């Protein structure tokens, strides 16, 4: 059966535990474990067009998901008026820090100045800034959940990301994974 049929039925029972949600039905053998992950750290450079590489590698079996998965990206366009003042303040602060004597011992000051300069330039030409998230959900039999988790970690680590298990936040993560659920109330 498809995952949508297992989750949507009203008689599906969700049992939360630290690693994820166990989905099952009374009187039916077998269960499904859903585990959810957020991104803990991003690579320094990674364009959205490269996201296709996060669904696995066709040529390397070790970098192929061993269970059904759901990869979701949520994008929230930030208020341009509010962001203009925030970006301006942070850009001024980054410029001051880059010109200070402490800049020599703080290597990330130059990178922060570049980031805030790019954000300020984008706002100056009428662009908007966004806040986004990625959510990964893996659906597997409980006995294969650890293996599926390790495979997902290997795929994402190979692209420079570090995944973070959403421990004790499974239902929120499930809602964040579903399409068309991102709204003001959920953001």
Residue ranges and their predicted role:
Residues 1-186:
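Extended, folded cores of ATP/NTP-driven motor/assembly subunits in large transport
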């Amino acid at each position: 059966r498809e995952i949508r049929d297992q989750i949507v039925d009203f008689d599906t029972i969700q049992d939360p535990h630290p690693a994820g949600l166990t989905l099952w039905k009374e009187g039916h053998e077998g269960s499904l474990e859903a585990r959810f992950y957020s991104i803990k750290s991003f690579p320094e450079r990674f364009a959205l067009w490269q996201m296709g590489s996060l669904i696995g590698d066709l040529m390397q079996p070790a970098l192929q998901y061993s269970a059904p998965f759901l990869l979701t990206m949520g994008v929230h366009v930030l208020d341009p008026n509010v962001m203009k003042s925030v970006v301006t303040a942070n850009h001024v602060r980054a410029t001051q820090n880059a010109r200070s004597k402490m800049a020599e011992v703080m290597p990330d000051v130059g990178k922060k100045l570049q980031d805030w300069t790019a954000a300020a330039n984008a706002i100056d030409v009428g662009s908007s800034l966004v806040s986004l998230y990625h959510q990964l959900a893996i659906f597997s039999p409980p006995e294969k959940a650890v293996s599926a988790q390790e495979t997902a970690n290997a795929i994402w680590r190979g692209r420079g990301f570090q995944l973070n298990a959403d421990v004790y936040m499974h239902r929120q993560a499930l809602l964040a994974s579903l399409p068309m659920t991102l709204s003001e109330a959920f953001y």
